[in-house]
Amino acid sequence: MKQITIASRESKLALWQTNFVKNRIQLELNIPCEISTMKTQGDIILDQPLNKIGGKALFMKELEVAMLSNKADIAVHSLKDVPYQLPQGFCLAGFMPREDPRDAFVSNKYNSIDDLPKGAVVGTSSLRRKAQLLHYRDDLEIRDLRGNIQTRLSKLDNGDYDAIILASAGLIRLELVERITQFIPVEISLPAVGQGIVVIEALERDNDLLEKIQKLNCRESSRVATAERAFNQELKGGCHVAIGAYAELDNNQITLMAMVASSDGKKILKRKMIGDDPTKLGKLLAQEMIALGAYKILES
């Protein structure tokens, strides 16, 4: 097969993820690859929260345009940045094994969320993290924090924040695990849908390529991600609402935990459901939570 061109964002984390996929394709499928890097609107507009400027799709559009114009064959993403609905003609072709899905508490002064003094300033731009943090500690001050991992860490080191919240997976992949002060338990902060999973996006029409990429697919990641994304799709959730979902696979049984919260964290609804059909499980849990008032909570 001809060389595969992989579209990637320019950040260190994006390139780590893309090189991980590139190496697997070359080693396991014996197909040569090259990486084409590009800036996305999500990388350029850093002075506003994502939920105010168009959401997670801002990290993908330029990569998808490259695929449509035959400048790239596939794109690599963090699954948590992929909206529940892809543009027509695109599909998720392969799911990589999941890294630690938990949120990370990072601080130079305090050992855990519990150690933070009243009024401590915590940096995150995620409504999901903000809502759950405020639900657990309503005496904290949450301030927006955008930029790549290195930018966020430097803002912490410069004293702009007492602590920041990041995805553990990104820090682990960039060999910055020593910066993690506390892996936040999922009981306190339920992860984002797909957090910790790297995914390959491709064009549906490219059957030959899809067949080959499928050989790299991690069944466990695919099944838990499908359950989490089905839940999110049924709720029609994006980055403008506080939604979390995390699934675990044991034999063939999937345990799906989900959370919706008001942006101030005062109202929160958590539920858990077990099943063996990931799509059905995600939809059923979402419907149960809708019946319990999920939409009212998200709107408040």
From Swiss-Prot:
Pfam families: Porphobil_deam, Porphobil_deamC
Keyword Transferase listed: yes
GO cellular component labels: cytoplasm
Further comment: The porphobilinogen subunits are added to the dipyrromethane group.
PANTHER family per record: PORPHOBILINOGEN DEAMINASE
Record's cofactor remark: Binds 1 dipyrromethane group covalently.
Family: Belongs to the HMBS family.
Record's protein name: Porphobilinogen deaminase
Superkingdom field: Bacteria
Record carries keyword Transferase: yes
Coiled-coil stretches noted in the UniProt entry, renumbered to this chain: none
Keyword field: Porphyrin biosynthesis, Transferase
Catalytic activity annotation: 4 porphobilinogen + H2O = hydroxymethylbilane + 4 NH4(+)
Pathway in which this enzyme or protein is active: Porphyrin-containing compound metabolism; protoporphyrin-IX biosynthesis; coproporphyrinogen-III from 5-aminolevulinate: step 2/4
Main enzyme class: transferase
Residues carrying S-(dipyrrolylmethanemethyl)cysteine: 239
